[in-house]
Amino acid sequence: MKNQAFNSILLDISTHLSQTKNSVEEGIQWVCETLKNNLTAYQWVGFYFAEPITKTLHLKAYAGAPTDHTVIPFGKGICGQVALSNAPFVVPDVTLQDNYIACSVDVRSEIVVPLFLEEKNIGQIDIDSHQPDPFDEEDTQFLEAICKLIADTYGNALLEI
């Protein structure tokens, strides 16, 4: 059932991105809103992009409650760890995670998947859930497909946001 929903949403995102001439910012904002509005476990969805010189991640689009964490140093929190590891990171229970930056007291779990452009980690998608342990390998594969679609759609323009 989850996979069927993911396939439908991925098709909607692919169609929207290919048929509209949105800016990168508008496109990734639309993706954030689409995921948050269509997947009950995705209470907060955001895209962070890397600034290699300062070794920081910068929040460029999100859907959900506002956050104070708009700039995250590499290595700090789940997002910062993914900036260094280049690998997806699923946290079933954030209360058990040592290197965790709390965005909201309501967050129970998190998944972060890197966004690659020409095999370089340029950013990531970050999902927070108020449910414990809702993310699995299907979520990881789905979010990897979304990141690839965004990289394929916008290419080097992603480096300019």
PLM region spans:
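Intrinsically disordered, low-complexity terminal regulatory regions
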Residues: 1-62, 66, 156-161
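Juxtadomain coupling helices with adjacent low-complexity linkers
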Residues: 10, 14, 129-161
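Short hydrophobic/aromatic beta-strand element in the GNAT-like acyltransferase core
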Residues: 44, 112, 124
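Regulatory sensory and allosteric helical modules in signal-transduction proteins
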Residues: 49-56, 60-102
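A short, aliphatic-rich beta-strand micro-motif
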Residues: 109-116
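Sensory-domain boundary capping and coupling elements
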Residues: 116-129
